[in-house]
Amino acid sequence: MTNTRFALLLGLVLAFVIPATPAHAAPKDLFNGRDLAGWVVMHGGEWLVQDGAIIGRNGTNWTTNPEKSGSWLRTEKEYSDFVLELEFAINAKGNAGIFLRSGLEKNPAFTGHEMQILDDHGNEPKKYTTGALYDVVAATKNMSKPANEWNKVRVTCKGKRIQINLNGEDIVDYQTDRLTRGYLGLQNHDAHAVVKFRHIRIAEL
């Protein structure tokens, strides 16, 4: 057998024996649907699990302590590059958010970013409406559903780039100058808000 034929045969064998390296880790659940295992309560409020969803209520009003930015749950570990998918629902006149790569010092909405969640279906998109990176960049469209209906969001963070897809529409594509590694968080902004989260999954890139 010539060297060329042997090399070709060896290549074919290795192709079947050695699995390809995946582009990123397989998605995993951040919420088991039963309890708050894997999550840490920050700054009070009431967090519970009901009917397969995390519910946040009786939050700490941020105006009494701006450094805390309301009550929130955070992940036990920090994340850098990832695709985060979840569903959320907010009550009438409610205010909540999703913290992305936030630190524990000062306000997590400004160490990392906060994806805003509001009861604002049909409103003009601004830097503080649903899907926006709060006080930084508005969504291109307000894709939020009416109060108490479930919304599906996908957030992709890779390096300095943050992309958000809400209810099937790409609405944010932004280059950040803030932390590129930190905690993920679920925020309940104040005592009036009742926010729900479910089907929380992450794939690290």
Where are these predicted regions, by residue range?
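Carbohydrate-interacting regions of secretory-pathway proteins
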Residues: 23-205
